[in-house]
Amino acid sequence: MTSASPSPLRAANAASSAPVPPPAMKPSAPPVNILPTQLARTYSFVHPAALLAILATRFQALVADPVAEMLNTLPFLALLQVTYVMVCLPPAGSVLPSPPASPVSDGDEKEKEKEKEKEKEKEKRKLPLRAGKLPRKKNQTHAAGLSAKLTPALLSLILTFLLATPVLSLLLVLFGAPLTTHNAETVLCAAHMALLASTALIYVHGVDGAVWREVWAFARPADAVWGGALGTALGAWFGAVPIPLDWDRPWQAFPITILTGAYFGFAVGSVVCRSSWLFGKWLEFTPEQDDRDKKTE
């Protein structure tokens, strides 16, 4: 008695019912590195430390008069954030994903070597410049590089005040800030949080809709920019915890602890998320594959 061979239809159904692993997550834009200069690397650590130092020195004034203190320190925070993005981060459009490597033939390699040799010979033939004279091309290149950074920095600052501040003000109200009172405190706190969280995001990613969908979905890979924004939000969230407690301390008034938490969150997030054990990773909210397999069995 011969056994019947399995039909190809059954084999196809069995193959289609097998669990398929989820596709690997790919961000629309790669994680952002700090610029590879000694100044950028040094200032990327000095900047969060300077923000915390300013907060510590002005904390008593913040407790005494939150509105006046937040209003007075807002221009300095804007200047520090613009300096930070210009010194440490690449502007939007300057970092592009690397194209796939194409096979290079021996002839192409020889041509490239010849071109490099020709360039070296041209550099050797150049006459030395006279002392006291600067090359015009170098000055023009420096001015163009400064303009390429200053323009997106100012645009990011404008968009931060026009768009991010109203959105964060609304979110503060939705999460419990007073609606009919303390309006100045709410708007100024939102402005400080917007400068901390949004300035670098807008400077680096511009108005790319795919990137901003990932930002609102908490699906960005970890880097200094995303870490600073996420740290600002989490710090403000945890900073609101002491407000309803009955400790009767003057620093518990709204929005002192929220603003303090936002500053600490930005400093910690921007430093920690650029470390080697977190850089490039992202939060995953999907269930584990093993749990899905158990439910289907």
From Swiss-Prot:
One of its GO terms (biological process) is GPI anchor biosynthetic process. Residues 1-18 have a biased composition (Low complexity). Residues 127-140 have a biased composition (Basic residues). The keyword Endoplasmic reticulum applies. The keyword Endoplasmic reticulum applies. Pathway: Glycolipid biosynthesis; glycosylphosphatidylinositol-anchor biosynthesis. GO terms for molecular function: mannose-ethanolamine phosphotransferase activity. It is a multi-pass membrane protein. Belongs to the PIGF family. This is Glycosylphosphatidylinositol anchor biosynthesis protein 11. It comes from Aspergillus fumigatus (strain ATCC MYA-4609 / CBS 101355 / FGSC A1100 / Af293) (Neosartorya fumigata). The lineage of its organism: Eukaryota, Fungi, Dikarya, Ascomycota, Pezizomycotina.
